């Protein structure tokens, strides 16, 4: 089962469609408007995550008569929104977004290459306690087809494709989505204390397109693919970078990461936790203005974002 957040933009007033964010369930080629059911649990994502502490989301969905609710035509997730179709929002409303680092061996090696303080990354990879850091407020997260940004004070910016866990207030994994943990590698490499500046800024976190519920999906064995498309002046678009990994290569379990995030902390609206990247482009690669970044995760879908120089 897959859920999404969506809205209908203001440029289509003649359609008399609701303008506030909605929760939807993806069913075949349609998005069914769960918010239209009037049930409090489907009013917002926060309400749903809170309700899931006592009742599984799958059980809440079984109580809804989907046939009686408005349904809107879905679309190819790699295409721009078409008039009259739901425009996808990032799957967060009031959740804090956190991230884990150095959870794959390849990520550890890349951090060692870029860093002046190399032993920091070696030690955290093997340590009992994982690296966890704050990534974004919900307001700064971008969704499918929205742009991701390149810092003007950095010359080495990369996408980091990651599986993201959707957690309820009890820190239970209720679903997964796709994340792009955009990073300025030169800033982080200069000094580990610069990590917040390398990771936390406007348009540096993309999530979506949907939340795949945990039931029936093994998130510890999912293929992840990254493609960066680039069009040179006067030339057709071509692949500038492509890579693939699997969550099976992750050094830590997902429950372990979620458990550490919840230690001595409270998340009344739930949280989203990025689980680290196992795909790191070579040291000679950096994102450029106009690139298109596509991240595909098995069982979830494809997150597509254009790149813009800030």
What are these regions (language model features)?
Residues 1-13, 54-230:
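Active-site microenvironments in enzyme catalytic cores
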Residues 1-54:
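Gly/serine-rich nucleotide phosphate-binding loop at the start of the catalytic core
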Residues 7, 185-310:
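Catalytic-pocket segment enriched in acidic/His residues
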Residues 16, 53-60, 262-267:
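Short, solvent-exposed cationic patches
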Residues 18-20, 159, 220, 289:
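Residues that act as N-cap/strand-start positions at coil-to-secondary-structure junctions
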Residues 36-41, 178-183, 246:
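Short, solvent-exposed aromatic-acidic interface loops
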Residues 40-72, 235, 240:
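Active-site-proximal helix-loop elements at catalytic-domain edges
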């Amino acid at each position: 089962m897959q859920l999404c957040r969506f809205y209908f933009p203001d440029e289509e007033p003649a359609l008399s469609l609701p303008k506030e964010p909605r929760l939807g369930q993806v069913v075949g080629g349609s998005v069914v408007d769960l918010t239209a059911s009037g049930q409090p649990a489907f009013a917002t994502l926060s309400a749903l995550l809170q309700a899931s502490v006592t009742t599984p989301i799958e059980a809440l969905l079984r109580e809804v008569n989907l046939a009686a609710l408005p349904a809107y035509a879905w679309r190819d997730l790699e295409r721009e929104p078409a008039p009259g179709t739901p425009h996808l929002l990032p799957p967060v409303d009031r959740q804090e977004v956190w991230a884990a680092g150095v959870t794959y061996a390849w990520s550890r090696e890349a951090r060692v290459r870029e860093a002046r303080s190399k032993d920091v990354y070696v030690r955290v990879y093997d340590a009992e306690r994982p690296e966890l850091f704050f990534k974004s407020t919900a307001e700064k997260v971008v969704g499918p087809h929205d742009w991701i940004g390149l810092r003007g004070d950095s010359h080495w910016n990369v996408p980091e494709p990651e599986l993201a866990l959707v957690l309820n207030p009890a820190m239970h994994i209720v679903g997964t989505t796709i994340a792009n943990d955009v990073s300025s590698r030169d800033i982080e490499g200069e000094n580990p204390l610069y990590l917040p500046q390398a990771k936390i800024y406007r348009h540096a976190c993309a999530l979506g397109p949907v939340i795949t519920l945990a039931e029936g999906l093994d998130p510890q064995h999912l293929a992840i693919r990254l493609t960066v498309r680039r069009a040179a002046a006067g030339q057709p678009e071509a692949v500038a970078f492509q890579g693939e990994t699997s969550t099976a290569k992750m050094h830590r379990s997902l429950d372990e990461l979620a458990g550490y995030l919840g230690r001595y902390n409270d998340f009344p609206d739930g949280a989203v936790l990025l689980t680290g990247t196992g795909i790191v482009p070579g040291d000679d690669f950096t994102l450029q203005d106009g690139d298109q970044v596509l991240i595909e995760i098995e069982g979830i879908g494809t997150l597509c974002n254009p790149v813009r120089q800030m």
